[in-house]
Amino acid sequence: MQFGTSPLAHMGLWVTDLAQAKRFYVDTLGFGLLRRMQGAVFIDAQGTLIALTGPAEQTDAADRFDPFRVRLDHLALAIVDAGELAGLRDQLDAAEVPNHGVEQEPGTGATYITFYDPDGIARE
């Protein structure tokens, strides 16, 4: 059965430090803060809802993202104008966010920046 889809509606992310994740998405990336609740923050990423949830009581305090486990590999967010990527790179550099600078995918010609959130998960 086929069904119609639209762009990503929302994503939920468990984070190790809710305040740090909120600063990253709101202050560093410039996304809108929609709402705060006990243990959660809701972000508007240009029309896509990002629900950030702080660590559960059962989460080991030393738990960290491991790129070699089964996991979400990365999340790619669309940008309206590829010309804005250089400004985003400068913004990430100023905030000392690890990134690979502006790159171009050899197969598709897509231009992007890979950068990492405070938990080490890749974003494009």
Language-model region placement:
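Short, conserved charged micro-motifs
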Residues: 20, 82-87
